[in-house]
């Protein structure tokens, strides 16, 4: 079975706009218009059996809509993660909702959500995710949305992991997109944690 562990698709109401913004920012031509249906068509073309669907709440008000949509996509070809926003006052309730929906983890994107991965204000959120026994996947390394400020460097990720050694952490982009040199060192130092690089 082939599973793509990092898939982005969007609610049809926002898919076209989201993909356009990402294309302008990254300079990368997308393979779909960002819908779940087109993504599944590409899975078929490329021999992919399932994909881990990762959606980002870029505003606190988006959490519930995104999580309910991700739950609708879950099963079949998608293994859906939910999303919370660090500025949402109701993050604990939303984590409980994610768990109730049967979603498989939580996606956080430090660049799009405006936090450093090792920021102390995130500790209570990481503790709540750990209590819910859910894995959390982070964008890590470079992102075109904030090219001059990397919100999740390998060193910062390691700082966070040391404070939360029981948190099930997945660092996307092999631990640091376009920052390959420090990744192996960080990974070796974090060997006693629940750290996974995808």
Where on the chain are the PLM-derived regions?
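Active-site gating/metal-coordination segments in enzymes
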Residues: 49-50, 60-152
């Amino acid at each position: 079975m082939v599973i793509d562990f990092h898939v982005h698709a969007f609610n049809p109401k926002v898919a076209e706009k989201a993909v356009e913004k990402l294309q302008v920012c990254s300079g990368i031509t997308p393979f779909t218009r960002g819908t779940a249906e087109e993504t599944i068509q590409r899975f078929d073309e490329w021999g992919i059996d399932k994909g881990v669907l990762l959606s980002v709440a870029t505003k606190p008000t988006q959490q519930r809509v995104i999580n309910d949509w991700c739950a609708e996509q879950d099963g079949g070809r998608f293994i859906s993660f939910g999303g919370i926003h660090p500025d949402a006052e109701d993050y604990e309730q939303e984590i409980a909702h994610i768990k109730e929906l049967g979603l498989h983890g939580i996606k956080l994107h430090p660049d799009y959500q405006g936090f450093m991965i090792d920021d102390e204000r995130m500790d209570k959120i990481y503790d709540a995710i750990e209590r819910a026994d859910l894995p959390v996947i982070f964008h890590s390394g470079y992102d075109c949305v904030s090219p001059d400020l990397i919100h999740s460097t390998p060193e910062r990720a390691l700082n966070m992991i040391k404070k939360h050694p029981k948190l099930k952490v997945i660092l996307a982009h092999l631990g640091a997109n376009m920052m390959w040199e420090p990744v192996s060192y960080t990974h070796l130092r974090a060997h006693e944690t629940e750290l996974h690089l995808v």
